[in-house]
Amino acid sequence: MKLLVVGSGGREHAIAKKLLESKDVEKVFVAPGNDGMTLDGLELVNISISEHYKLIDFAKTNDVAWTFIGPDDALAAGIVDDFNQAGLKAFGPTRAAAELEWSKDFAKEIMVKYGVPTATYGTFSDFEEAKAYIEKHGAPIVVKADGLALGKGVVVAETVEQAVEAAHEMLLDNKFGDSGARVVIEEFLEGEEFSLFAFVNGDKFYIMPTAQDHKRAYDGDKGPNTGGMGAYAPVPHLPQSVVDTAVDTIVKPVLEGVIKEGRPYLGVLYAGLILTADGPKVIEFNARFGDPETQIILPRLTSDFAQNITDILDSKEPNIMWTDKGVTLGVVVASKGYPLDYERGVELPAKTEGDVITYYAGAKFAENSRALLSNGGRVYMLVTTADTVKEAQASIYQELYQQKIEGLFYRTDIGSKAIK
């Protein structure tokens, strides 16, 4: 069968590469993809993620069995609804179900209504009201744009002034456009963060290994928030009992809740969680795979990925299997200046061979050669599996040291929280 993956980043590279490993898959198209993906035998399709009807025509013309939707903005724009209306299968939630991600206020309302543990909060479109709420509750406090903001719409404010400034930028300075026309302001939760993903169809769901992402740009969790600078899975120091509690108190009630609201969920659900003194609580939901977590979760899948998704789409029981070997860890290499202004056009090192996988995100061929150049904020990610976090770290950082990259940067402490 032939499959289509929509998106262009490292997440989509990992999804498409894993699908191509399946025995029944002859071809995986990626729209629009990036040039680095072609090194793994993936076929790029020059159609933007916003051109739903061109993508639908392509899928029909090329006899695509089903389409896997990667990015949040495509889901929020109703790409799955459009595919379904055209009689095509797509793996991802409808626009209504994806509102769990594209409106933080909606997600909060669902959590409160169905008793899911999360931070106390207020939602505001008026700056003076937001300011009064911040001044009443004090800092630290968290200010979030209600809508999608490329993972950069969250400010963890250490002071009241910082929080007021963040609210001002979103509500009055239009920093995130319509996405910041409302803000959710919530209590700062103390604890360790982790990610929990599940494949979902309605009330049936299949939990993946836990993961831990590193959002801040620089070592020691310093600097601005990014889309994510590295991750590892599973989280070795997180007891299974915590995962079981999260499933019972968070995943189940939310999925049952959206069914009751007439928005049944199909696709990947991501729960960004924090383990507090009162147990796991929700920081946010995403309506799709995380980036960079996908790149360290999918290499742990030992079953046939394409068959697993086909079964879930067909409401059959999938046979999903994961390795229990050690840990999978990955480090993102980004353009200097990311997540703010950054340069493009830096020549990239050769693709890794053997146990270290390269997933490309912002990469394109030079105009007159096959040299890969940087073409985005996050450029590529190196991933490996080893018996321990320490061994995986050593393997990745040795490879990065040998690559001697200039004009790019990476964090040198990915996974260190897991080394006691």
UniProtKB/Swiss-Prot annotation:
Binding annotation for ATP: 134-195
Domain of life, source organism: Bacteria
Keyword Methyltransferase attributed: no
SUPFAM superfamilies membership: Glutathione synthetase ATP-binding domain-like (SSF56059), PreATP-grasp domain (SSF52440), Rudiment single hybrid motif (SSF51246)
List of residues binding Mg(2+): E284, N286
InterPro entries xref list: ATP-grasp, ATP_grasp_subdomain_1, PreATP-grasp_dom_sf, PRibGlycinamid_synth_ATP-grasp, PRibGlycinamide_synth, PRibGlycinamide_synth_C-dom, PRibGlycinamide_synth_C_sf, PRibGlycinamide_synth_CS
This protein's pathway: Purine metabolism; IMP biosynthesis via de novo pathway; N(1)-(5-phospho-D-ribosyl)glycinamide from 5-phospho-alpha-D-ribose 1-diphosphate: step 2/2
Single GO term (MF): phosphoribosylamine-glycine ligase activity
Cofactor: Mg(2+); Mn(2+)
UniProt catalytic activity: 5-phospho-beta-D-ribosylamine + glycine + ATP = N(1)-(5-phospho-beta-D-ribosyl)glycinamide + ADP + phosphate + H(+)
Note describing how the cofactor binds: Binds 1 Mg(2+) or Mn(2+) ion per subunit.
Leader sequence residues: none
Family from the record: Belongs to the GARS family.
Protein name per Swiss-Prot or TrEMBL: Phosphoribosylamine--glycine ligase
Organism of origin: Streptococcus pneumoniae serotype 4 (strain ATCC BAA-334 / TIGR4)
Gene assigned in the entry: purD
